[in-house]
């Protein structure tokens, strides 16, 4: 099974081992301060607080909003996001104070059309969620609506940018949250961070996140929480931030490979990637595709890939589908389309090129499956069927069967169609297309065939 995500932590353990050997395993120890300083330097932010997970940090966004702007009674929320965003909001506000926004079919984020943003209520707040690492240009929204208070769930957008600064660090945001969960670009297992550029918010939150203790030990003067990160988690964070350039370079390369291998499906509009906002740079967190016109259910789609030993995830459900949020209105058909058509595919930092090829091959197969075609894959056990078919083509002098002699072997291996060998009906020999390499003599040939009834339909690379 090619898992959806596996952390690559083995090279970032030295500081954690030191922390264990030194006996500093709780929220005290040298790596709390060291990691905080490193994170501030990397993000070029004034204040950060390391926390035990991203959800706690997101909860603190709403606590900060309530503290600074107690009279705000409407918070605009995104649809189709990980549930932590809404659960965090509901820990501070009641559901009637939350209003769900429309979604954008192209960015898979909230609709940021100027007319729509200008139509929103005055003196409200908005939670920005950078879905799947696609960054929303918050400074642009603030310029359109200076009266709206913005807070950012940056748990999936960490390392993304808007206007050449890291997402979640703009003065236009009250504060933002980061997740260092096991499937994130940087991981501490669990873990997260709270970011702000505002001193009053920092001073409030530094007390709230650590039991609300007064100047007298064990006397507490405010309702607060224990959201502290451990020194061991901070040690993992410290080692990774020190190598952040290489970590990001590796992830960018993985994304570039997927983009190249999937290029034909993108060109032929079989799949789409998300569209980015102007002046933004997305975070290379988890590669996702939208399968245009997917006729299969989420369960059928997931099952298909699992049978091919590919672990995928569906896009986040419309919020009204969660039982405790079922009273929400969902007048946005786009949210249902995105939920059905988008899948997240394996994006581990240590995924191999061969594994990426296998993932892409499974996507090609699913596209055919989505057309309700009976797919038959030629293997070594039934290669004689293919040879028999090829001989018939030769006899009939089908000019659409093309031969390529003395092709470079790497070129053949990298050509996606050489890996996909499909047959619709073995008995009638009606086929979408074949690819075959014959090593029967010193030279070899490479052939592609596309059945007449499928020509011009732009199926796969054929």
Where are the regions a protein language model picked out?
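PLP-dependent aminotransferase-like
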Residues: 64-154
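Acetyl-CoA-dependent GNAT
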Residues: 389-453
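Phosphate-binding glycine-rich loop
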Residues: 28-75, 80, 88-95
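N-terminal "arm"/small-domain region of PLP-dependent enzymes with the aminotransferase-like
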Residues: 1-26, 346
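PLP-dependent aminotransferase class I/II
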Residues: 31-38, 42-49, 125-129, 135-138, ...
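Conserved active-site segment immediately N-terminal to the catalytic lysine
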Residues: 151-188, 216-219
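Conserved acetyl-CoA-binding loop-helix of GNAT-fold acetyltransferases
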Residues: 450, 456-462
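Conserved N-terminal entry element of GNAT/NAT acetyltransferase domains
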Residues: 1-2, 368-384
């Amino acid at each position: 099974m090619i898992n959806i995500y596996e952390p690559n932590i083995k090279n970032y353990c030295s500081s954690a081992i030191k922390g264990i050997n030194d006996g500093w395993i709780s929220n005290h120890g040298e790596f709390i301060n060291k990691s905080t300083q490193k994170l501030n330097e990397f993000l070029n932010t004034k204040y950060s607080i390391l926390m035990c997970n991203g959800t706690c940090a997101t909860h603190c966004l709403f606590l900060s909003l309530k503290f600074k702007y107690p009279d705000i009674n409407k918070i605009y929320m995104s649809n189709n996001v990980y549930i932590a965003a809404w659960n965090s909001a509901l820990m501070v506000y009641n559901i009637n104070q939350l209003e769900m926004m429309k979604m954008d079919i192209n960015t898979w984020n909230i609709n940021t059309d100027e007319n729509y943003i200008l139509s929103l209520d005055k003196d409200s707040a908005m939670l920005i969620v950078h879905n799947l690492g696609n960054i929303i240009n918050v400074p642009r929204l603030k310029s359109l609506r200076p009266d709206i208070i913005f807070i950012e769930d940056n748990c999936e957008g960490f390392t993304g940018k808007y206007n050449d600064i890291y997402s979640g660090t703009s003065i236009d945001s009250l504060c933002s949250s980061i997740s260092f969960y096991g499937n994130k670009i940087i991981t501490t297992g669990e873990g997260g961070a709270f970011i702000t550029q505002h001193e009053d918010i920092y001073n409030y939150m530094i007390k709230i996140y650590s039991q609300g203790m007064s100047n007298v030990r064990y006397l507490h003067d405010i309702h607060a929480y224990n959201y502290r990160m451990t020194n061991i988690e901070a040690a993992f964070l410290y080692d990774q931030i020190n190598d952040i350039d290489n970590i990001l370079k590796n992830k960018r390369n993985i994304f570039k490979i997927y983009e190249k291998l999937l290029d034909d499906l993108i060109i032929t509009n079989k799949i789409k990637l998300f569209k980015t906002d102007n002046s933004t740079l997305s975070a290379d967190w988890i590669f996702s595709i939208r399968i245009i016109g997917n006729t299969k259910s989420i369960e059928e789609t997931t099952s298909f890939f699992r049978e091919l030993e590919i672990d995928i995830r569906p896009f986040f459900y419309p919020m009204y589908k969660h039982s405790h949020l079922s009273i929400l209105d969902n007048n946005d058909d786009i949210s249902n389309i995105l939920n059905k058509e988008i899948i997240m595919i394996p994006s581990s930092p240590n995924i191999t090129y061969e594994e990426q090829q296998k993932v892409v091959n499974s996507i090609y197969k699913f596209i055919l499956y989505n057309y309700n075609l009976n797919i038959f894959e030629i293997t070594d056990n039934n290669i004689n069927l293919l040879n028999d078919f090829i001989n018939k083509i030769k006899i009939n002098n089908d000019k659409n069967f093309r031969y390529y002699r003395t092709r470079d072997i790497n070129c053949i291996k990298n050509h996606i169609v050489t890996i996909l060998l499909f047959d619709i009906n073995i008995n009638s020999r009606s086929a979408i297309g074949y690819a075959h390499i014959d090593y029967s003599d010193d030279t070899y040939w490479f052939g592609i065939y596309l059945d007449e009834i499928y020509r011009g339909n732009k199926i796969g690379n054929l």
